[in-house]
Amino acid sequence: MNFEFSSDQMLLKDQARKFLESEESVKKAREVLEGEQTHDESLWKSVIEMGWTATTIPEEFDGLGLGYLELCVIAEELGRSLAPTPFSSSVYLATEALISLGSNEQKQNYLPKLATGEIIGTLAHTESTSSPSIENLSCELNSNKLN
């Protein structure tokens, strides 16, 4: 079994690293942490333009249709550089939940928008079949444990 990245994956990794170094993402992360922003908008737009938000989205939904190893090399470089973007919520959480569990209608509606960065995704979960509301919560936090 070969655990090495392919030459294409190494090229992607090198390009991602060089790009993120040129963007001074560590400096941008500090600015986001010390400011009111949720992420660095200009860096996020660049990530979208590079096609990284479309990495694992199937081509039929306007994605690149690449695999998890390609996603891994991009994610590793984003993490290494502390890139302050909503990549994790949009790509790992929302995109993967839709690919794995979404109806065809949900996939057609949301995956192309996630691929192009038109929307930022995240994952939400509710406890019951009732509408999400603080009054409907039965889960409590006691001694740092959910009960």
Q: Can you describe what each PLM-predicted range is?
A:
Residues 1-88, 109, 113:
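Amphipathic, small/basic residue-rich leader segments at the start of a protein or domain
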Residues 4, 56, 93, 124, ...:
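Conserved beta-strand segments that form the floor/walls of ligand-binding pockets within enzyme
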Residues 15, 23, 77-78, 91, ...:
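Fold-independent oxyanion-binding glycine-rich loops
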Residues 19-23, 97, 121-122:
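Short alpha-helical functional segments enriched in proximate histidine and acidic residues
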Residues 37, 50, 92, 117-119, ...:
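Short, basic and Ser/Thr-rich N-terminal targeting/leader segments
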Residues 63-64, 105-147:
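Glycine-rich, Trp-frequent "lid" loop and neighboring beta-strands that shape
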Residues 83-105:
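N-terminal glycine-rich flavin-associated loop
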